[in-house]
Amino acid sequence: EIGSTIPNATFAYVPYSPELEDHKVCGMPTSFQSHERWKGKKVVIVAVPGAFTPTCTANHVPPYVEKIQELKSKGVDEVVVISANDPFVLSAWGITEHAKDNLTFAQDVNCEFSKHFNATLDLSSKGMGLRTARYALIANDLKVEYFGIDEGEPKQSSAATVLSKL
């Protein structure tokens, strides 16, 4: 709901470092709490069902990478791509998307953040288990300013839509 406070959830990620560009190097995951990290900041959270999946890789995440400077020019402090994937997979995906340290790729641990918004998908029939739905959220000082969810192709959760809401 617009104006509501985002949940204080745990996210796990591998911080970017140039050494990770060598695909044989594996970074060490760490975690953060949403309230601690995002208090006083404007954050765009982009949730995807899965790293390296066709729609997420081809259509959803690349425009966020391409438009990062435009997003930052509109006051965005951080863009975070979240999914149920483990932080190692998300780190590798961020590298292949050429995101460097411009975006954070983080695991929504047990989908707790997404569950708060009823934005999860049970993809057990496809062998993928519980996943985050495809959505985008703008939070400003922990308050929801925009929430857009998609069932198929990115529309409400696209970079273009998010930019129009900033």
From Swiss-Prot:
GO CC, alphabetical: mitochondrion; peroxisome
Single biological process term from Gene Ontology: cellular response to oxidative stress
Start and end residues of each Thioredoxin domain: 1-166
Listed EC numbers: 1.11.1.24
Gene3D superfamilies assigned: Glutaredoxin
Coiled-coil intervals, chain numbering: none
Enzyme class: oxidoreductase
SUPFAM superfamilies attached to this UniProt entry: Thioredoxin-like
Motif (Microbody targeting signal): 164-166
GO MF term set: thioredoxin peroxidase activity
Keywords: Allergen, Antioxidant, Disulfide bond, Oxidoreductase, Peroxidase, Redox-active center
Catalytic activity of the protein: a hydroperoxide + [thioredoxin]-dithiol = an alcohol + [thioredoxin]-disulfide + H2O
InterPro entries, per the entry: PRX5-like (IPR037944), Redoxin (IPR013740), Thioredoxin-like_sf (IPR036249), Thioredoxin_domain (IPR013766)
Active site, per annotation: C56 (cysteine sulfenic acid (-soh) intermediate)
Cross-referenced CDD domains: PRX5_like
Pfam families with a match to the protein in the record: Redoxin (PF08534)
Subunit structure of this chain's protein: Homodimer; disulfide-linked, upon oxidation.
Leftover remarks: The active site is a conserved redox-active cysteine residue, the peroxidatic cysteine (C(P)), which makes the nucleophilic attack on the peroxide substrate. The peroxide oxidizes the C(P)-SH to cysteine sulfenic acid (C(P)-SOH), which then reacts with another cysteine residue, the resolving cysteine (C(R)), to form a disulfide bridge. The disulfide is subsequently reduced by an appropriate electron donor to complete the catalytic cycle. In this typical 2-Cys Prx, C(R) is provided by the other dimeric subunit to form an intersubunit disulfide.
Biological role stated in the UniProt entry: Thiol-specific peroxidase that catalyzes the reduction of hydrogen peroxide and organic hydroperoxides to water and alcohols, respectively. Plays a role in cell protection against oxidative stress by detoxifying peroxides and as sensor of hydrogen peroxide-mediated signaling events.
Family, per entry: Belongs to the peroxiredoxin family. Prx5 subfamily.
Name of the molecule in the record: Putative peroxiredoxin
